[in-house]
Amino acid sequence: VFVALILAIAIGQSEAGWLKKIGKKIERVGQHTRDATIQGLGIAQQAANVAATARG
């Protein structure tokens, strides 16, 4: 992040806007990945509960 910031300042404002757009895209992908992981964990937990109930 620090290196990208230095590059943005060195290259100029137009390039900084470009870097910001890429940063937003990466951030959005990260959020989707996090949400999918949380959902996956929830489903895995439910499956484990069902298996435990079936065994018990």
From Swiss-Prot:
Q: Which UniProt keywords apply?
A: Amidation, Antibiotic, Antimicrobial, Immunity, Innate immunity, Secreted
Pfam families cross-referenced by the UniProt entry: Cecropin
| InterPro entries per the UniProt record, alphabetical | Cecropin (IPR000875), Cecropin_insect (IPR020400)
The GO cellular component terms are: extracellular region; extracellular space
- Keyword Magnesium attributed: no
Entry-annotated residues carrying Arginine amide? R55
**Localisation:** Secreted
Matches recorded under PROSITE patterns: CECROPIN
Chief localization: secreted
Q: GO annotations under biological process?
A: antibacterial humoral response; defense response to Gram-negative bacterium; defense response to Gram-positive bacterium; innate immune response
Q: Which domain of life is it from?
A: Eukaryota
**What task does this protein carry out?**
Cecropins have lytic and antibacterial activity against several Gram-positive and Gram-negative bacteria.
Family membership: Belongs to the cecropin family.
Protein name as it appears in the record: Cecropin-A2
**Source organism (scientific name):** Drosophila yakuba (Fruit fly)
